[in-house]
A protein has these predicted regions:
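Flavin-dependent oxidoreductase catalytic cores
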Residues: 1-168
Length: 168
């Protein structure tokens, strides 16, 4: 299984058409499945996650002795350094469908799967598997609860889990 970008999320980064060509080359090498994602963490971190970074929480969790200067910068200009990307469920689906049309190999959809209905939509669009992130961080029993037809994650995409992850 290989994880690859559908686009990088900034002007000079790879765009969809280029990433489709990369994926087609990967497919030629007999990879079992491809996980489709997007974003370049150091330049466009919230392309891959959506929502806003909780700047105060991020600064709070940073080591005050090692990163004092970064904590100070975050508190004053963090909102400019890490712009908010509005969250919507299945946020990569439209782009991922372009890859589905261009590739024959199994594809793993990732991006805003917050309930059973989202997973079923991705599977109905031709994706072979779904990958779930935030919803599992919020509730480790999420997959079992998805057996209920209308179950939806309680995750509000506050991204406090991301702030903590970046500071460990």
């Amino acid at each position: 299984v290989v994880k690859t970008n559908m686009y990088d999320g900034f002007k000079s980064g790879l765009q969809v058409e280029e990433c489709i060509k990369v994926a087609q080359e990967i497919e030629k090498h007999g990879v079992h499945a491809l996980v489709l994602t997007a974003g370049f963490v150091s330049k466009a971190p919230f392309t891959v996650m959506g929502g806003a970074m909780p700047i105060k929480a991020l600064a709070h969790y940073m080591n005050p002795w090692t990163f004092w200067w970064l904590r100070l910068a975050l508190r004053f200009v963090g909102h400019l350094m890490i712009p908010t990307v509005p969250f919507k469920e299945l946020f990569f689906l439209d782009t991922a469908k372009q890859f589905r049309k261009a590739l024959k190999m199994p594809l793993i959809y990732v991006g805003g799967v917050m309930g059973r209905d989202n997973a079923e939509t991705a599977l109905a669009e031709g994706f072979d598997f779904v990958q779930i992130g935030h919803a599992l961080v919020k509730d480790t029993d999420f997959v079992n609860k998805m057996k209920e037809e209308h179950y939806h994650s309680a995750c509000k995409r506050s991204n406090y889990c991301v702030a903590r992850m970046y500071t460990i």
